[in-house]
Amino acid sequence: MKFTFCLTVLAGTFFSAHSSVQKDDPSPYLVYLKSHFNPCVGVLIKSNWVLAPAHCYLPNLKVMLGNLRIRIRDGTEQTINPIQIIRYWNHSHTAPQDDLMLIRLAKPAILNEKVQPIALATSTVKPGTICMLSGLDWSQNNNGRHPDLRQNLEAPVMSDTACQETEQGKSHRNSICVKFLKVFSRIFGELAVATVICKNKLQGIEVGHFMGGDVGIYTNVQKYVSWIESTTKDK
């Protein structure tokens, strides 16, 4: 199955998987949530815990870490089953708010240069800050269902006021918005910009069906740090 992409975004530096130079960007905290349904991206926050959007709660879920390249193996590849999945207590399928879940791995991930947890943001980032949007993409020769590249781009964070004035931002609370400088339109485009990383900390994680035009809406992770820490403590 071949996915066809339409990419028309310019927001700082983007290392497109369809450019002449393909490379795997350094984002060792990203994990691929593999299932028989739509692809999803999660973030390793501890060696045995992954933070992900709650809408990624799918049957037969497997957590893939390390190298994702199909034809190139380097020994960092890991596939771990979830042993426990905890959705945020207030999450609802009928509303986009609180779209978070925690995945407890059956065993701790083996940390290496391509598998590393990332710290959580504990404060709100200032509007105008240039942050990195980190996600997964398909390489040019990948005709399969699953992404095989980590890709990064840069984009500025919007103010809360500007966010609430957008069509998407009106219906989201506890959110952070970023500005795509040109329209971003592609199949499974949310995978390529799945997380917001500011000052080397996880600031945002994508909300289901969050993109429209030139704005991306993300769950503001720092609003949920207390829940995350209490849930994962000593486990």
From Swiss-Prot:
Q: Where in the cell is it found?
A: Cytoplasmic vesicle, Secretory vesicle, Acrosome; Secreted
Residues in the signal sequence = 1-19
Cysteines joined through disulfide linkages: 40-56, 131-198, 163-177
Q: Pfam families recorded for this chain?
A: Trypsin
Entry's Gene Ontology BP terms: binding of sperm to zona pellucida; cell migration; germ cell migration; positive regulation of acrosome reaction; positive regulation of fertilization; protein maturation; proteolysis; regulation of protein processing
Q: Which domain of life is it from?
A: Eukaryota
Q: Which residues form the Peptidase S1 domain?
A: 20-233
Keyword field: Cytoplasmic vesicle, Disulfide bond, Fertilization, Secreted, Signal
Which family is it part of? Belongs to the peptidase S1 family.
Its annotated function is as follows: Plays a role in male fertility. May have a role in sperm migration or binding to zona-intact eggs. Involved in the activation of the proacrosin/acrosin system.
PANTHER family of this UniProt entry?
INACTIVE SERINE PROTEASE 37-RELATED, KALLIKREIN-RELATED
User: Per its record, how is this protein called by name?
Assistant: Probable inactive serine protease 37
Write the lineage as a comma-separated list.
Eukaryota, Metazoa, Chordata, Craniata, Vertebrata
